[in-house]
Amino acid sequence: MQNDEEPAAAAGTSGLSNGESLRSPPAPAPRRPKPGILRLDIGKPRRSSGGSVDFRCVGSSSSNGNTSNVATGANSENNSGVTSPHQLSVTWAPPCDLDRGGWQMQSSADAKREFYKGQRGRRAASQEDHRSYELNDFPLQNQSSDAESCHQEPHFAHQRSPGIGFDEDGGGGDIDDEESYTISVSAIMQRRASVRGYRGKRGSRSSRRASSPMDHVLDSVERRRSSVYTTSSEEGTNQESTQEQIFENIRLHKEVIQSVKLQPWPIRKKLKLVRQAKTYVARHEGALQERFAMSRSTRDLWARFKILMAARWRHWKRETASFLTVLIPWELRIKEIESHFGSGVASYFTFLRWLMWVNIMIAIPLVAFVIGPEYFATKHGETDPRKRMSDPEARVAGNLFTFWEFEGYLKYSPMFYGYYSSTSGISTSGYKLPLAYFLTAVLVYIYSFVATLRKMAENSRNSKLSSKDDECVFSWKLFTGWDFMIGHAETAHNRIASVVVGFKEALLEEAEKKKDNRNWRVILQRILVNILVMGLLGLSGATVVLLVNHSEDLAKHDNWLSRNAVNVTMTLLSFFLPMIFEALGLFENWHPRQQLRLQLARIMILNMLNLYSLMFSFIYKINSKEKPLQMLKLENETNTMELKNLLSSIEALRAMTPTTSLYGESTSDGLFDDSTSTATWGEDGGGLFSTTAAAALISTTVQRLKCYNMTVKCSKLRRNIISGKHLATTLMVLNLTTPAMVPPTLPTTLPTTFPTTLPTTLPTTLPTALPTTLPTTLPTTLPSTLATTTATTSSIWSTTEETSPTTTTTSPWTTLPPSTTTTEATTTTERATTTTEATSTTTLKITTAEINSTLSDTTKPLGKSIDTEIPNSTTNSATLSTIPATLNTTNLPLNSTTKLTTTTSTEKPQGEDNFIYTTGEDEGSYDYGSDSTSDAPDNNSYSDITDYSSEPSEIEDFDEQESTDQADDPLAKVLEQLDENETKGRRKRALAESPFFTSKYSRRHRNESAVSAGQPRETTESVNATPSRWPFNWASFRQTTPRTTTTRRVPSGILTKEEWERLRRLRGRITTTTSTSTTSTTTRRPRWRYRTTTTELTSTTEEESSTTESSTDSSSPGSTTNAFDSSSSTTEEDEYTTTEGSENRPYYVGYVDISEMGSTIYYDGDSEFLEECVITICPKGDDFFGSTTESPDSTTQSSDSKQLTTVKLTPLERKQKRLKEVQLAIKQIQTNLTTMCWETSLGQELSKVIVFDGLMSIVAPLCIDFLRALFVRYVNQNWCWDMEKTFPQYGDFKIAENILTLINNQGQVWMGIFFSPGLVLINLVKLMIMMYFRSWIVLTCNVPHEVVFKASKSNNFYLSLLLTMLFLCVLPVGYAIVWLRPSWHCGPFSEYNRIAEFITNTTRNALPKQLHEPLDYLTSSSTVIPLLLLLILIIYYLVSLTGALREANQDLRTQLQKEREEERKKIFKVPEVKQAEPTATTLTNRWRKVLEASSPVTPTQPPDFDTEEYKNQARKELISRIMKKALRKGSATSDEDSFVRRDDDDTDTEHQDSLPHDEEAKDKRFGLSRLQQIRRTRKPSLVDIVQIAKQERARAGSIVAGTSSSGTGNFPIKETHPKSRFKVEKHERKDRGSMKDKKDTRHRQSPQQQQQPPPYESPKDNEHDPDTNSRIVSASLLRRHKEQAEGEEPPTTPDAPQTPNSPVEPVEQALEESTPETPTLAKSKFHIVDEKKPPPHEVEDKPLPTPKESGSGGGSLGKFKFRKHKFKSNNVAAVKPEPEVFKFDERSVERSSDVPATHAAEYLNNEPSGTEEQDRSLPSPTPSQGQGHHQRQLSVLSRQGRKKIGNLLALVREAVNLKKDDVEQAGSDESPGPTTPTYLAYTPPPPPSVLSSVSSSTALEMPPTPEPESPTPSAPLHFGSSTSSRAPSKPPKPPMVPASATAPTATMDDLEELDTAGPITFPRRSDSHRRRTMRQDSQSSIWSDNIPTITISTTGSDECIVDAAAPQNGLPDPRSASPEPTVNIIRIDIENEHEK
């Protein structure tokens, strides 16, 4: 909270922010004094806050209401004790004339300004002032000048008197103020002279404190000041000097204006001073300007201009600064929340605001470099499918659900990855969008890391800077907690709430430190809770994974919940599980902050689990989408190529319609028939058709041509017969359908192979494999595809090929293959081949059937190929497995399984491919299958297809003209050759396909090779080609083109069998295994990869198929080659004559091979050797169709019935018809592609999660907080229980959940930013909405947490969670960039295999080649691993260094603290007295003195020092103690405390959190006996032991005596903290031994004594240790007197009236025992509990008190936890009145404690009640009051230290003398108010050990002024409670020994006091202290500044620090009763209080 931070500010600042200071004295109108914001009574003295500095003039001390003597400025400053003179640029005039008004100037500038304003009228005065300033006699000059100015001012001010005579109140107040003003001004001047000396005008200006808020004011007078100022005298006739003086005075006044606000005066006084100074400044500035105006010199004009400009500039600067503070978003809102709910809740909002800044910074580069350019560069009518939605989408784009799903307009917007393109938009203008996209994303992630780390480092620094906060937590809070600039009631209310909450936080910290965490029950609970939490986390992760895996099934249910199951579930999990975690966390019993952190960590793990489950399941889905995507790509490319070819061929056909028709009928048909033929040939020689791809394409073509070619073995020329045009057309079709592979091969291959193969195969295989098979197999393999295919096939067969394409298309939609299949199916329909086409698989199967026969021979060799193939085309086989099975079944008989499989496979593979493609028919399917097998293969397939097309198609495709030409007969020839060569020379595509080209892209090569193998059937190749990326394909194509050309040449030239074989072998294909066609294929394949691979590819296409298709596939490879070379033939040949095939292949006589293939049986050598001639038979087309059609039903035969009308169509019609189909297919592909962009879909999912989460974060609070609050608020009145207090209550703000929601939300944004750049903008809107909504909910419906705790100051815990989240969220993005293949149809990286490839290639291209190798080396593991090791070592080193520096820092801090202590001691050191040192000698001397002085028992050694010496010592120690406390150096701030806190909270928590009693060490010291203390520091010396023994004896004697001995025991030995500790240790030791015995007695006594001591202490805030000492010294006397006085106590009651003076003591008491002190402290807050036996002791004490009220008072002190003096003799001591050195004014105690002057009996009652009251009072309100009171007292003490000490000593003296009797009586009578007894010493001092335990008693060794004079003191001692801690202020006690006054430190109460030297009479305290050491110390220290004995126990444990002050009379009975020290604790239950 601010409170905590403010203390960190220099003590000089009273907690005002600079901004406020800027705004404070309204600078805007410096000329006109304005009324102040707060109006306070000027007359009313105001205490300075701890942080303020008092500048006192000697005479003015009264003005402050402080009685401190301000003899000199230095003294006054010292007295203030808050700021050192150098902290302020202005020094308040120390000695000032009273006339001047003992002003303590706050800011010289301000004061002067006001002062001068007051003097506005008199320049002369100002001059005088200047003069005076110049003179070093500041006080006099100032006074004179001020006086003069005032006199001169009359016109300006009411008074002529001291310059500030404008007291609004007027009259004396004015005079006082004026005096103060003049004094302040003079002080300022003096300070300036002394500190700065008067330097030249410029110099002085520059010397001004740069930080001063009024810099501008001073600067305004940027006048040249020459030494003249200082030198000029009086008005100085010299105008220049006057000007300079005026400048100087103006500057000084401005400085006064600046620093006034730091003063502790009443606000009215400050305002008046400021107004006067401003008036002066305004007037004199105006005068100067007038003077300048009269002067015409350039210099004056320039000066005038400068003045004007300076004023304007200052004004503008300040206005700007004020305006900027308003611009900080939500600052005021957050401050308001902080004041009501604590820093923990506010930390959420500051964190949210910081996150918003980070998001803005992330959004800027994204918008500037990615979103903006692409959006603005996109034209309105963009045709790019990435930027334009399809018609179906456009129709629903405006629906709400469409927006909710981020579809429609949002999907086609720059928000998502898919919108960006490297080919359209800004890229067309030369902007490298992919590079910009990638680099911006990297920049965003780097910035996120850097911003988070910078913030963490900054927070660490800040928390280090505030480390001193842990020194005096409570004083800082109390003294500097208020903001004096507050001018609004509501704000003041907030501030009060904030201060209270701050105290609660600090107290909680203290309480938590006392907890014992080692408890088996707690440990077990924690273990159980953690097990449960882990189980819940595992369940949530499993739920998300399960949901994502089934999301597709769920999406089929068309309802909102099913579609959004994933994000709804994630939101619900993140909503409910944290609640469960929170409930479980309650069982763990952690500190609220620790519990919060655990909760945060658990929720963090939960969110990360859910997020990661989501990401990984998405990645699996993405992987599953990849194959269909590649199929679609292949199909798309095939169709695109076909479209291109169709267009060109249509043009060609139109040009040559007649020929074309004929050809179309015959050659074309032949060509097509080759494809189509397959069906027909399927009947005849299915072999031709075997090339499914070709068949498919051809069938399509045939459908168009309506005729099929019959393959007959003939010379190779025959192949040429196929008209080039038809071939071209076919090839084009094939290209379009498949990547044009089919056309080239098909015409040749189909006719050749299919004729033979098809018929046989069709019937046999086809039924199974083809339509039938397709249905059968496909259904199995490709249920959807097959079904489609089958249906298509059937319809196609019966209907038209068109249908089939459509159907196919549908299937392909499922997977691309189907579309291909459709084409093929269509082909099949058109011809019998349709079967092949539609189910190329089928056709192949037909081929297989034939091939089975033929292949039977060949199949086996093929089988090997196939087998090889199959592995490659695993996918296909899997896909086609069904088909293969069917085929196998059908074919098996024919071939060996292998052969049959091979044949079947060929067909099947196409089907499979189709299947994989879903419909890719033979060609498409097959290719797809191959592709399918491996994505790369797909790509390869695609390439292959391309090659296929390429040959015919590439020529046609690539070279449409060529294709067209080839369409002519030459083309047909080429195509035929290609078909045969196609295997080799499907080249164009094959090129892509070709092994060599393939090798380029290994995956593609594999695919391509597979494709080649399978592709020989063009389909496969097409497929393969398609699979290969277009880029690759095209490259391949291009390369292929040459290759194709080569291939074509080869086809034309026809490779020799040897060449083919060689090629095939190169491929590693089973050339031999496969027939020649296979070989050809193989050869071709081999180029690709392997003959086997080819086979495999085929096989791949139809993985299983490959088996079946071995021949086909093999043959596919060969056959494919054949198919392309001679499709069917190849298949069969492969199977049946690998050798033959090889031979043919060399020729790559597609037709021959095909014909051979066609005649499945003949393939062996003949088919391959002979070229097949294709005879176009239209009727057969029917057969073909029939066979195809039937083939689904009846294998092949339906081809007859199937005659397609297509056959009758002219080639042109067919092409046009096909064109429509292709266009439709392409459209369907595009439709399918719209949902296939995985990057966009991932971005959409994350966007939905974020938006849904945002909605939940609004809806949930509305229901959970708002509606509940309404219900509770308005229904509570009529409810049967109190809903506000019990259930359901008002909601509180769940910090952990809300913080984690923010972090999780930001993690999702980071994860999605790469896939959805627009996500940041959505998140920004969400964050702003959440800020407003959440802050409204918090302020409206929430209540602060019951347990308020401080947020870690740095909030680094939140940031570390954020950093972890950032790191974890970058990992999936990195994975996607490096490992996942980007979608090929969307996004800027669609052309690359991997997104990372892009950046690699870009880098390589940008760098010269010479650097490539070094780069490769640098990025290799040989460099990276050593680098990582090096970094790890560096990190280790830095971590070690940090640890060492932290330790050094700690040591330095300790050293500083010690030095500070020493300085303070010197400052407060009384010149005559030398500070007591903890050395053994000093201790010895002190003990000796104590024993001699106070103990009648040990009068042995007369004190070496006179009573005066003792007094001096006591005084000295008291002063040092006061200093410590004032500066908060005391116990709370002890090093140990700081250390603890630092180590614990370091950067995360505020050091201020710890309470003073945190320091166990100190507490321990207090609790320790003297010997123990000595041992801590050194080895106890013999002297120590002797002294201790004497003390013990003395104590025992005192206990026994009960009178003087107690005095002796109490006899304060002045000790510094260390000594006190030693005493405590000794005391404890003694306590353990004799104390136990004495304890009871002591308990009785100590309660009384303690009661008295606290009051006594309270007066001095434990700093009255001297009093305690005095008490101790005179304890014995007091005891005697007490016994006597018990009766007299009632008289003491009158002393109570002095309570006002003694309030401090009472306060302490109140803190210690609220009873006595309640008046001051609002007793209710602090309960005094006897630690050991609080109630019993109280009771005991009470009884004892009854006899001796003071004793009872002691008892209450005992409760205070003052060590109960173990003076069993206390009773005796009580009997002995002599030692009663101090007796607290029991009355005051009573008054303060609520138990007013209760008699002994009453006291007994009251005391307990006091305790109770204190418990009640413990509520922070009282503590704060007490604290405030005490702090004020403290400040007074610090200021008036000497006076107070003197007074206190006097009081102690009085108390000792006068109060002996009174105290005794008062103690017994007033026991209720025992706290009042200032004379702690009164408590029968225990033997030295007691003293030691009382350590604070050390301070004053008062010669026991046994005289009853002390009685008076009882009242005076009370002074602490009502009075500021100036106990001494009670002069009535002057009789008390001054030393005793010092002694009175409420040692018992304030551990600090105990620490400090001074007689502390808490004998009992030793043990209790030991127990309570920590708590007491820190607690007491908390209030120690001014609250002597109050122990604040957050835990509320009895171990409060409140040890009874030294038993006053030492009613020994209560204490004595129990030998063990009874600790009376004041327990302040803050929580209880709050509840109350």
From Swiss-Prot:
Residues on the membrane's Cytoplasmic side span: 1-353, 419-432, 548-567, 621-1308, 1380-1423
Tissue expression profile of the protein: Expressed in multi-dendritic neurons of the labellum (md-L), which extend elaborate dendritic arbors innervating the bases of taste hairs (at protein level). In larvae, expressed in class I and class II dendritic arborization (da) neurons and bipolar dendrite (bd) neurons (at protein level). In adults, expressed in various sensory neurons including those in the mouth parts, olfactory neurons in the antenna, wing bristle neurons, haltere neurons, arista neurons, and many other sensory neurons, including a subset of chordotonal (Cho) neurons.
Q: Where is the composition biased (Pro residues)?
A: 1903-1914
Where does this protein have compositionally biased stretches of type Basic and acidic residues? 125-134, 216-225, 1538-1566, 1614-1640, 1658-1668, 1727-1743, 1777-1793
Phenotype of the disrupted gene, per the record: Viable and appear morphologically normal. Adults display a significant reduction in the electrophysiological responses of multi-dendritic neurons of the labellum (md-L) to mechanical stimuli. Adults are unable to discriminate between the preferred softness (1% agarose) or smoothness (sucrose solution only) from harder or stickier food options. Adult females display a reduced ability to discriminate between small differences in egg-laying substrate stiffness. Larvae display abnormal locomotion behaviors that likely result from the loss of proprioceptive feedback.
InterPro entries in the record: TMC, TMC_dom
* Listed Low complexity bias regions: 58-73, 886-906, 1069-1083, 1091-1100, 1107-1130, 1890-1899
Intervals, Extracellular compartment = 375-395, 454-526, 589-599, 1330-1358, 1445-2036
Q: Where is this region: Disordered?
A: 1-178, 194-243, 789-839, 860-967, 996-1027, 1066-1143, 1186-1205, 1527-1572, 1592-1841, 1859-1990
Question: Where in the sequence does UniProt note compositional bias of the Acidic residues kind?
Answer: 166-178, 953-967
Biased composition (Polar residues) is annotated at: 74-90, 227-243, 870-885, 933-952, 1806-1838, 1976-1990
* One of the protein's GO biological processes: perception of rate of movement
Q: A Gene Ontology CC term for this entry?
A: dendrite
Q: How does it sit in the membrane?
A: Multi-pass membrane protein
Q: Which GO molecular function annotation, any one, does this entry have?
A: mechanosensitive monoatomic ion channel activity
Which keywords does this chain's UniProt record carry? Cell membrane, Cell projection, Ion channel, Ion transport, Membrane, Transmembrane, Transmembrane helix, Transport
Composition bias of kind Basic residues appears in 198-208
User: Where is this gene product found?
Assistant: Cell membrane; Cell projection, Dendrite
The protein depicted here goes by the name Transmembrane channel-like protein
Q: Report the source organism.
A: Drosophila melanogaster
